[in-house]
């Protein structure tokens, strides 16, 4: 038996954060019904270039959608009155609703939290948006990069001092989906105690802000926050002779000592946190790594018991 066996979820969400949340709930045993608006499906097809594919190719892509796994899907234009009646009937028998529309959109269709609570006051309604249901940015549309930008997390990303960088991964999306699922589970426990439903307001910008927690806790005086980028030589990504890469993270002194002895530079040991020495050390480390292939370095680093990992591509990581 899974944690959410017997729970029913009505999922209005369309892009990554909301569907990731409902996918996690499905993995925990919930019965998830996904509402897909035909007009939204066509919009997404244009966004991702699927409109140029044949019908068979589009169907194959949809069938491979990880975030649809374990869910039932109903194609329903929620802008029609008849669709509203169907959704209200579904809401009567549901425990959880997940949505990712901007504030006011579902309310304007008569499908907001208050509308659904009239037929089911014990509903847990989880709303996922860029910047939440309140505040000056509540009506802003946007995806993962904007959450990273508005939270300040993007300002810390990358090694270049002249400009911030995009991580290239949907970090805020996945974090928000995970946080949303966690919030739903907490609301389920609370409902068991109180018998009351709950409205959950999940902002992608808040989830992305969590990425700043470490630096903010160490620097309550924001003027002391160090510049973006690496400031130490004991971590890095190094190109090998065969074009492969090795990542190292010898932050603890004992691992750094082992690494320095391995590459025959014990004089670096006391310079571990010396930012002035970093560039010269890194340049030398880079040249050293280019003398051997990735498998050769894996063997040497493993023997020396340092902290390292080959940088695997997705095919290698899935093996």
Region roles according to the model:
Residues 133, 161-170, 192-206, 225-230, ...:
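Conserved Rossmann-fold dehydrogenase catalytic segment
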Residues 74, 200-202, 308:
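Generic structural signal for residues in well-ordered beta-strands
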């Amino acid at each position: 038996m899974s944690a959410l066996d017997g729970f029913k979820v009505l999922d209005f969400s369309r892009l990554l954060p909301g569907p990731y949340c409902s996918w996690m709930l499905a993995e925990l045993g919930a019965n998830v019904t996904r509402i897909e608006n035909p007009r939204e499906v066509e919009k997404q097809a244009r966004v991702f270039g699927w409109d140029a594919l044949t019908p068979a190719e589009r169907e194959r892509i949809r069938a491979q959608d990880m975030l649809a796994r374990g869910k039932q899907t109903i194609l329903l234009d929620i802008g029609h009155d008849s669709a509203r009646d169907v959704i209200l009937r579904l809401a009567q028998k549901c425990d959880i609703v997940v949505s990712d529309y901007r504030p006011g959109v579902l309310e304007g269709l008569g499908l907001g939290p208050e509308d659904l609570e009239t037929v089911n006051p014990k509903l847990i309604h989880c709303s996922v948006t860029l910047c939440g249901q309140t505040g000056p940015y509540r009506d802003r549309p946007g995806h993962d990069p904007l959450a990273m930008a508005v939270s300040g997390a993007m300002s810390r990303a990358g090694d270049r001092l002249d400009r911030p960088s995009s991580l290239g991964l949907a970090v805020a999306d996945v974090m928000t989906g995970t946080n949303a699922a966690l919030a739903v589970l907490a609301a389920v426990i609370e409902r068991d105690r109180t018998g009351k439903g709950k409205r959950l307001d999940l902002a992608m910008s808040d989830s992305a802000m969590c990425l700043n927690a470490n630096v903010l806790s160490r620097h309550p005086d924001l003027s002391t926050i160090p510049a973006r980028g690496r400031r130490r030589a004991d971590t890095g990504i190094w190109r090998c002779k065969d074009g492969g890469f090795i990542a190292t993270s010898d932050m603890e002194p004992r691992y750094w000592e082992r690494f320095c002895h391995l590459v025959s530079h014990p004089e670096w040991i006391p310079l571990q946190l010396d930012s002035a020495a970093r560039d010269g050390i890194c340049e030398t480390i880079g040249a050293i790594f280019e003398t051997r292939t990735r498998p050769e370095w894996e063997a040497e680093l493993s023997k020396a018991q340092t902290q390292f990992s080959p940088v695997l591509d997705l095919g290698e990581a899935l093996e």
